[in-house]
C-alpha cells in the first residue's frame, strides 16, 4: 500500500546535463510499505556486472507505446566499464527506468536499468549503469535511514511454538 522509504544515490542530481557521472548514479531503491506476494509478482535477481558482447533484452513503456509493454528480446552490451554500460537497444523517450535483462542459469536477471538513449540518426544507443555495487550502497542507505527496529511484545506459552522464537519449551 505505497512506498515506505526511498534511497537515491547522492551522485545523481536531477536536472543537470547528461554525463557519465549522472548515468552511473541514475538509480533509486524503493522500500514498499507492504511486501508484494510472490504469487502476484516474482522478484528478479541482479545479474553479475554486465560485459561487452553480452546479449540482453529490454522491457519498457516508451513514448508512442504507453498502452502496451514493449519487449526487445535481443540487443546487446556494446561497451562496459567504470560503472557504465552502452547498449544497442532501441529505446525511446520514456524508457528511462526500464529493466535490462540477461539470461543467467536459465533465469532472467536484471543487469542494468535504462538511464538515457539516443535515436537521432544512426544506430540506436542506450546507456545504463552497473548495478551490483550501486544497489548494495542503496540498501545500506535504506538500513541507515530506517532507524533502530522497534521491539514488539509477543506472548509465548509453554508447549506452543518454539520454532518462531528459537527457544524450545517443554511442559514440566
Functional labels for PLM-detected ranges:
Residues 90-114:
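Catalytic nucleophile loop of clan PA
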Residues 7-13, 90-94, 115-119:
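Short, solvent-exposed aromatic-acidic interface loops
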Amino acid at each position: 500500500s505505497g512506498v515506505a522509504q526511498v534511497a537515491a544515490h547522492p551522485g545523481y542530481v536531477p536536472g543537470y546535463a547528461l554525463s557519465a557521472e549522472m548515468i552511473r548514479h541514475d538509480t533509486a531503491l524503493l522500500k514498499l510499505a507492504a511486501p508484494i506476494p510472490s504469487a502476484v509478482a516474482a522478484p528478479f535477481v541482479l545479474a553479475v556486472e554486465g560485459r561487452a558482447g553480452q546479449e540482453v533484452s529490454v522491457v519498457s513503456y516508451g513514448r508512442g507505446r504507453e498502452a502496451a509493454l514493449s519487449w526487445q528480446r535481443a540487443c546487446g552490451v556494446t561497451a562496459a566499464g567504470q560503472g557504465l554500460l552502452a547498449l544497442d537497444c532501441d529505446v525511446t523517450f520514456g524508457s528511462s527506468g526500464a529493466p535490462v535483462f540477461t539470461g543467467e542459469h536459465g533465469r532472467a536477471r536484471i543487469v542494468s536499468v535504462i538511464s538515457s538513449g539516443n535515436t537521432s540518426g544512426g544506430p540506436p544507443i542506450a546507456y545504463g549503469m552497473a548495478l551490483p555495487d550501486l544497489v548494495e550502497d542503496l540498501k545500506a542507505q535504506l538500513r541507515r535511514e530506517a532507524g533502530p527496529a522497534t521491539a514488539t511484545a509477543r506472548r509465548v506459552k509453554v508447549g506452543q511454538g518454539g520454532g518462531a522464537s528459537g527457544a524450545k519449551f517443554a511442559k514440566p
